[in-house]
């Protein structure tokens, strides 16, 4: 029998200000990878993390 997948999945977090802000320190979009528990957090994740392109802490949202 095949084993079922675990509850934890790998997600990607992307900076929300990098796309709309043309005056950045460097070109590009900040992305982080992390895991989340599918049972406990069913909605999309939003975490404040440091963006090296904007050079400040910004909100990073989960992307598909």
Swiss-Prot record:
Keywords: Ribonucleoprotein, Ribosomal protein
Domain of life: Bacteria
Pfam families cross-referenced by the UniProt entry: Ribosomal_L33
GO terms for cellular component: cytoplasm; ribonucleoprotein complex; ribosome
GO biological process, one term: translation
One GO molecular-function entry: structural constituent of ribosome
KW Ribonucleoprotein (keyword) present: yes
Gene3D superfamilies to which the protein is assigned, alphabetical: Ribosomal protein L33 (2.20.28.120)
PANTHER family with a match to the protein in the record: 50S RIBOSOMAL PROTEIN L33, CHLOROPLASTIC (PTHR43168), LARGE RIBOSOMAL SUBUNIT PROTEIN BL33C (PTHR43168:SF2)
Family: Belongs to the bacterial ribosomal protein bL33 family.
Protein name as it appears in the record: Large ribosomal subunit protein bL33A
Protein source organism: Synechococcus sp. (strain CC9605)
């Amino acid at each position: 029998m095949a084993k079922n997948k675990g509850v934890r999945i790998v997600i990607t977090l992307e900076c929300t200000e990098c796309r709309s802000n043309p005056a950045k320190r460097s070109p590009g979009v900040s992305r982080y990878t992390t895991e989340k528990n599918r049972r406990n957090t069913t909605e999309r994740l939003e975490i404040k993390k440091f963006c090296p392109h904007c050079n400040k802490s910004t909100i990073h949202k989960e992307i598909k």
